Amino acid sequence: SVEERLTISNMAVEVGAKAGIMVPDEKALAWIRNRTNKSFEPVYPDQNASYFNKMTIDCSILVPQVALPHRVDTVLPIDSIGEIPIREAFLGTCTNGRSVDIEVAARILKGKKVHPDVRFIVAPASREILLESIRKGWLEMIINAGGVLVTPGCGPCVGTHQGVPGDGWNVISTAN
């Protein structure tokens, strides 16, 4: 999806790249057209462009990963870390507070309760996603399960507010 491409581009920079650029295709252009009535001109690479490094990754062979403190690029396969009790679960921010993320969480939590020792915080990536999540009832499911909603956008990933964990807390988070 376009949203997944945006996440990959954002995370490329988080792990040290200067940029994470994807050539726009019709799907990306339609996504932009649906969000603005202003004209725009897509940017494409020159026909004879040279690259320092060009990577192709077969995502179908990737296994779920978990980043360990305190860097997003210190990762291990999730199956290799064993069971670790958590104190906070954070879903959201600009990178991973997408509609699909919130929908999946809502469906998992429907009819269930968040553990009383766990603080579950949801930060939609944007106002648009917040409104969609309200309309579709996803946030109601999450709140009924014991989750907490915070304003869309940045927060604990920059260490400023809305979900900054307590000392010694283990946190599972989609934030970058």
Describe the function of each predicted region.
Residues S1-N176:
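Fe-S-dependent hydro-lyases/dehydratases of central metabolism
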